[in-house]
């Protein structure tokens, strides 16, 4: 599908299977692109310095949510560019962003600090589940949180002392699958879990 040198990754498909959104450094920065899979035509979604990745379409295909870093200070910008030149990023300070599928109405969804990432739409399309360590004093643990698409009504979902991330709903909204290193006997194993979801 892509053949450019560099980083083309983190791809997900629209619900109708006609489009793909992915992260690429083809511009010299890590930006999001939407590709029509039939024609191969692309649209660049993001245009601001920082890492934009991990994007998902809403269930109706009309919106996109993703994680992004936005280095602001001269020191942070310098560090980001130096790491990027080596093909690296430091994903420690990220917020969630949302926009329409055509790139319009782009806005920041969270302003929590630390790392807010792995967002996924609830099947009704009105809420987003994501992983965050914003309540952690030392960067750990990560728990799952739910937030409305307008940035209101933040709610904590899991209460783990380890790592919960990569949430995915079943299409009917009855089940939630996620990755966690809970119940691993103190080791570093990360396993998959599934839970019944009740609104």
Q: Where are the language model's segments positioned?
A:
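Short loop/turn segments that connect beta-strands within beta-propeller blades
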Residues: 36-40, 100-104, 148-152, 197-199
């Amino acid at each position: 599908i892509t053949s450019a040198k560099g980083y083309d990754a983190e791809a997900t498909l629209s619900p109708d299977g006609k489009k793909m959104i992915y992260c690429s450094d083809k511009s010299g920065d890590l930006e999001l692109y939407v590709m029509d899979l039939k024609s191969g035509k692309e649209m660049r979604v993001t245009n601001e310095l920082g890492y934009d990745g991990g994007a998902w379409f809403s269930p109706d295909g009309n919106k996109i949510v993703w994680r992004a870093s936005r280095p602001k200070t001269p020191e942070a910008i310098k560090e980001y560019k130096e790491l990027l030149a080596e093909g690296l990023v430091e994903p420690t300070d990220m917020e969630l962003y949302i926009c329409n599928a055509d790139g319009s109405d782009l806005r920041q969804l969270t302003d929590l600090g630390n790392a807010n990432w792995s967002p996924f739409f609830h099947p009704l399309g009105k809420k987003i589940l994501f992983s965050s360590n914003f309540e952690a004093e030392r960067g750990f643990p990560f728990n799952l949180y739910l937030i409305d698409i307008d940035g209101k009504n933040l709610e904590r979902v899991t209460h783990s002392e380890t790592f919960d991330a990569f949430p995915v709903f079943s299409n009917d909204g009855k089940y939630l699958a996620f990755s966690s290193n809970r119940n691993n006997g103190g080791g570093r194993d990360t396993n998959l879990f599934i839970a019944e979801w009740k609104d």
